[in-house]
Each structure stands twice: as C-alpha cells, then as structure tokens.
Design a protein with these regions (language model features):
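N-terminal glycine-rich dinucleotide-binding loop that anchors FAD/FMN and/or NAD(P) in oxidoreductases
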Residues: 182-211, 245-254
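Short acidic, glycine/proline-rich loop/turn micro-motifs
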Residues: 19-24, 179-184, 243-245
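Rossmann-like dinucleotide/flavin-binding elements
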Residues: 138-172, 211-224, 234-249, 253-306
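Redox-cofactor binding/interface segments in oxidoreductases and associated redox assembly factors
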Residues: 11, 73, 230-233, 274
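Active-site charged/polar residues at nucleotide-handling catalytic sites that mediate phosphoryl
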Residues: 66, 225-226
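Flavin-dependent oxidoreductase catalytic cores
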Residues: 1-147, 151, 155-167, 239, ...
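Short connector loops at secondary-structure junctions
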Residues: 12-17, 171-186, 197-198, 301-306
Length: 306
C-alpha cells in the first residue's frame, strides 16, 4: 500500500545509530543488503541506503544487481571527501577507504570536533585555503628525517614528500605500520591495516621519499644523518599504574599486564580481569580474544555503558 507513495525510499534497519553505523568489529561491508533488497523488490521508486560501504566495487555491485539505486556513504566520505571524483576519474587505487573504527561516531556522541583515523585533515574545513589533499610546496629543497614508521610517521613522510622535501623514513622494526601490526590482529580489526597500506601505496608514488626498515636510530645517528628537519613519531606505551580516563592516584600493580605485554607474548594464566578505563576498543577486543583462547574473562570498566 505504501510502496509508491514516497518519491524516494531511504531504507535503514530500525533502531538507533548502532544499527546503521556498526563498526568493522561487528559487521561486514554492506551488511544491510538483504533488508534493502526486500524494499527495492516492492517499489519502482528510487531506493537509497547505508550499511558500512567502503569499497567502490561493493557499491557498484549493489547498484548493478538492483539492490538499490544509489549509495549513502557518510563515513566513506569522511575518510575520503573525493571518493566520487576518484571513482569517476579511474583513481580507485588512491581512495582512502574507511576502516570502520567509528572514531567519527564516537566524536559525534561526545559532542567534540569530528575526527577520522584515515583522514587527519577532517574538521579543518574552516581554514582559509584549506584542502585535504593539496598542500603548499615547501619553499626550499631540504631534507627531512622521520623516525618511526607507524601511522603518524607514514602520514608525516607522505605529507612532507608531497611538499617536495627529500624524505627518509627510518623504522626500527622489520615492517611498517607500528601499532597497527599488533592491533589489526584483534577480532574484527583486520580492516585497520588500510591505514598503513594506503600510505605505503601513496608514498610509493613519490620518488623523493625513501623507506628504511630495520633501521633503529639514536641521537648520534640522527646527528650524523644531517637532516634539516627531524620528526619523532615513535609512539607510546600503555601505562600499568591504573591511570586512564578517570582521575585516580597511580598505583603499583606488579602482576598487571598491559596490552603491550599481551601483544609481546606474555603468558596469561587463570581467570582474567580486563580493566577498561580507556572506553574505546582495546579492552573489549582483548577480552574477546582472551575468551576465545579459553580464559575465564571478567570485564570491568569505569564507563557508564560498556
């Protein structure tokens, strides 16, 4: 009876944003396809929907198969504002695909400025002359040394390279990616490696950026290198004194393990208490992994909602 009444059907699974904005941990790409296809089969009017789309191939597939007529892609457009243009111009390899981490949704929930793991320029639109991908050339032909090949180091090397500097990126480990090499092994977080993969791909297009894995550097090495600019992107470590979001006095916990310890292969025995005072992904994902390994896990958090 209602099939032909609207001019457009905007289809979504009912319920709060937890349904249409699911993260990569809890849903695959295009997870609402069956629901959308059902509505499309009942009407001749145009149908649009969402469902964590990131890949142009998946978007085109649903349109060609008649699942819907056009795609709603908010998070993919946050990660890459030029997604439609890159598809139109045949530059699919340059698309900065959304990883489904939902840091954008978290920012919206908290009423703070929007941010994006894939797109560090998100929220800078108010700046005069701002552009998320075009950056002014550096006025001099100088050398820059970036120490640390994690997400921040890769982004710094890419940006400096686009500005025209001669860039060397030194990473102490054998591979690039930093924390991603560990975190992407947690349940549902494999897509997070896109942060590394996209930057390595784009750096590969720049002849003025060189990558040096397995290259630890101390102060003497930096001085000997003789760069005009040195950037430290060596990351940080998890605290083991109980301090997180909540204001508490640091305490000693000799038996406590941090995520760094677990990723390094520390032996985990007996019932496990995972204490979460970060309120993001790490504690829940670690608890899920430990439970899958057969441990009895108790999840404790200071957050009002787990």
């Amino acid at each position: 009876m209602l099939a032909e009444l609207p001019d457009l059907w905007d289809v979504n699974v009912a319920g709060a944003l937890g349904n249409d904005s699911r993260s990569a941990r809890f849903s695959g790409e295009g997870f609402q396809e069956a629901n959308v296809a059902f509505v499309k089969s009942l009407t001749t009017k145009p149908v649009v929907s969402v469902g964590r789309f990131t890949s142009p191939d998946r978007m085109v597939s649903q349109i060609r198969r008649g699942v819907q007529d056009f795609i709603g892609a908010a998070r993919p457009s946050i990660a890459d504002p030029f997604l439609p243009a890159k598809i139109r111009e045949g530059r699919e390899d340059e698309i900065r695909e959304c990883i489904g981490c939902n840091i954008c949704r978290a920012a919206n929930n908290e009423g703070v400025p929007l941010r994006c793991t894939q797109n560090p320029t998100m929220g800078e639109e108010w700046r005069r002359g701002w552009h998320p991908e075009r950056i002014a050339a550096y006025p001099k032909r100088e050398k820059a040394l970036v120490i640390g090949g994690g997400p921040a180091g890769l982004e710094a090397a890419l940006t400096l390279g686009r500005r025209g500097l001669e860039v060397a990126l030194a990473e102490a480990g054998d591979g690039f990616g930093g924390r991603l090499l560990r975190e992407a092994t947690l349940p549902g977080l494999a897509t997070w490696m896109r942060v590394r993969d996209w930057r390595l791909h784009m750096i590969g297009k720049l002849p003025n950026v060189q990558l040096f894995p397995a290259s630890p550097m101390g102060a003497a090495d930096v001085a000997e290198f003789g760069a005009d600019h040195v950037l430290l992107a060596t990351g940080s470590h998890w605290r083991r004194d109980g301090v997180g979001v909540t204001a508490i006095r640091p305490e000693e916990f000799p038996a406590a393990l941090t995520p760094d310890d677990v990723f390094a292969g520390a032996r985990v025995t007996g019932p496990v208490v995972v204490y979460d005072d970060e309120h993001y992904f790490m504690a829940g994902a670690l608890a899920e992994r430990l439970a899958a390994q057969g441990h009895e896990v108790h999840y404790v958090t200071t957050a009002a909602v787990a």
